[in-house]
Amino acid sequence: MGHHLKRVVSPKSWGIPRKTDKFVTKTSPGPHNKNALPIVVWARDQMGIVRNMKEAKHVLREREIIVNGRPVRHPDMGIGIFDIVSIPKSGKHYRILRDKKGRHVTIPIDEDAASSRLVKITNKTIVKGGRIQLNLRDGSNVLTDKQYKSGDSIVLSLKEGQKNEIIDHFPFQPGNMAMIIGGKHSGVVGRIIEHIPVPGSLPNRVILKDESSGESFETIDEYVVMVGRESPAIDRWGIEE
C-alpha cells in the first residue's frame, strides 16, 4: 500500500468521507505540501467527475484535466490552494481555496479568471547571469529582473505565449489585503495592520483586521497570502467571505 493511505488518517483538509473505502490514493511528491489533494481524490470524491481510478486514468490520458495551464498525467499529483483547475470538455474552471475549517474548497470561476494564478513568494535566490529566481509556495519558481520581497504575492499568466509571465504584484505590507490559509483564522480575508519580526527561530507575527467583522486578530506570517493592495481583490479571486 505504498501509494495509498487509510482514509481515517487522511488530512482533514481533503474534506472527504473517512468511513467509505478503507484506502485512498496518497499524494505523490511534488507541488504544495503533504496536505496537497491528489487530483483523483478531487475528481472522484469532491467533484464526481469520475467514479473510480480506471475512469480517472482514462480522463487524464485524454488530457481532460488541466492544472495551472498544464495537462495532468498522474492521478496522484497533488493540487492545493490557489491552483487553477480547468475541464476543457465542459468549459468549466475552478480555483482551489480553503474554508474557515481549513478544508480545500473548489470555487467555480470564469474563463478570464482562469487565465492567471496567484502565488506567494517564499524566498529568492540569485542564479547564473545574476537573475533573480523567485521560489514560490507551491514548489515552482520563476525568473525575474525586478525586485520582489519574500512574502509578496505575484500573479502569473496562464495564457499561451505568456505563460508564467508576472502580470501583477501584491506586496506584503501594512494596508494591503491578505487571506489566511492556516490556523484558527483560516479562510479569513483581512487588511494587514502590522508585521512584527520575532527574534530567533519563532515565526514572525502579523496583526490584521477582519474585513467582515471589523475585529483585529493575530496570526503568523507563514499563514498569510497577499490577495490585494489597498482594496481587496475578493470578487476577482472568488474568495468567499
From Swiss-Prot:
InterPro entries: KOW, Rib_uL2_dom2, Ribosomal_eS4, Ribosomal_eS4_central_region, Ribosomal_eS4_central_sf, Ribosomal_eS4_KOW, Ribosomal_eS4_N, S4_RNA-bd_sf. One of its GO terms (biological process) is translation. Gene3D superfamilies: 2.30.30.30, 2.40.50.740, RNA-binding S4 domain (3.10.290.10). GO terms for cellular component: cytosolic small ribosomal subunit. Residues 37-100 form the S4 RNA-binding domain. Keywords: Ribonucleoprotein, Ribosomal protein, RNA-binding, rRNA-binding. It comes from the Archaea. One of its GO terms (molecular function) is rRNA binding. Belongs to the eukaryotic ribosomal protein eS4 family. This is Small ribosomal subunit protein eS4. It comes from Methanospirillum hungatei JF-1 (strain ATCC 27890 / DSM 864 / NBRC 100397 / JF-1).
